[in-house]
Amino acid sequence: LAFMQGGFGYLGTSTERRDRSRIETLANVDVEAVWIFTRNREIDSLAQLQGLRFGIGPEGSGSRNVALKLLEQARVTGKDITLSRLTGSAAVQALRQNQLDAVLMVAPPESFAVQNMLGLPGIQLANLRKSAAITERNPFLESRLLPQGTLDTNLPPRDITMLTTSASLVAREALHPALKRLALAVAMEVHTGGGLFFRAGDFPSLRRIDFPTAPQARDTLIHGLPLVERVLPFWWAQVVERIVLLVLPVTLVALWLMRLIPRYMRWMV
């Protein structure tokens, strides 16, 4: 089991699908925003990042994965920009000390690093005017409006168009179906509330997923857990299900043989 950010279902910086045969989606459970902060400058296009020192996070991180895709599509290459592995609190400090010019983070609004960035003087939040075009090219992204004053009395100071992606709960295809149902049941309890970019009841969902849906996921989201798993503790529910699946067929065969054997014996006599 793992939580996976939108976009990891695509190869490298392209929008070509990965081999998705071994991973299944149980549900999307949250929305994370793509925050692009700049120091002492306002930008509305990714092309304006050329020549800047840009923090996008370490290798393998969700922030770096999204940043490289967006930079490639904006035709900003490695020779046009200085990329940094800094992220989180380290990126906040580097931006404050003029060691970076811009930072991209993929995180929920409640993130400590995001809150710190928003509170720094001279730090601007990018307002991407071509966000609709970006989402057309990247199915795992959505364009959302962050209205003025949403985060604080005057934060942001104006309406901002942002990119967002979903965080998904995924599992290996070989994981036992009962464990998949259990994980999804927990997600349904924990992730049903609302947030900045979504309303209560929007999650868990199966919209805009990167990997195929687990068969148990759709059934559980629509119908809930099987009756036995709702009534009994998980371990006992599995015992009862095994009894039903194994003992009941054997019992039926035994009863059939008990009726058949006497007739066969009489026929032999």
Indicate residue ranges for each PLM-predicted region:
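Secondary-structure end/capping motifs
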Residues: L145-P212
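Extracytoplasmic/secreted proteins, especially bacterial periplasmic and envelope-associated proteins
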Residues: S21, G62-K69, A90, A94, ...
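Sec/Tat-exported extracytoplasmic proteins
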Residues: F3-G6, Y10, N40, Q50-R53, ...
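Short, glycine-/small- and polar/acidic-enriched structural segments
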Residues: L1-G51, P58
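N-terminal hydrophobic or amphipathic helices and topogenic motifs
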Residues: R18-I23, A27-V31, H191-V269
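Solvent-exposed, acidic/flexible segments
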Residues: L26-D30, A47, I56-R64, S84-G88, ...
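Pocket-lining segment of extracytoplasmic ligand-binding domains
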Residues: G78-T164, L175
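Bilobed "Venus flytrap"/periplasmic-binding protein-like clamshell domains
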Residues: E32-Q97
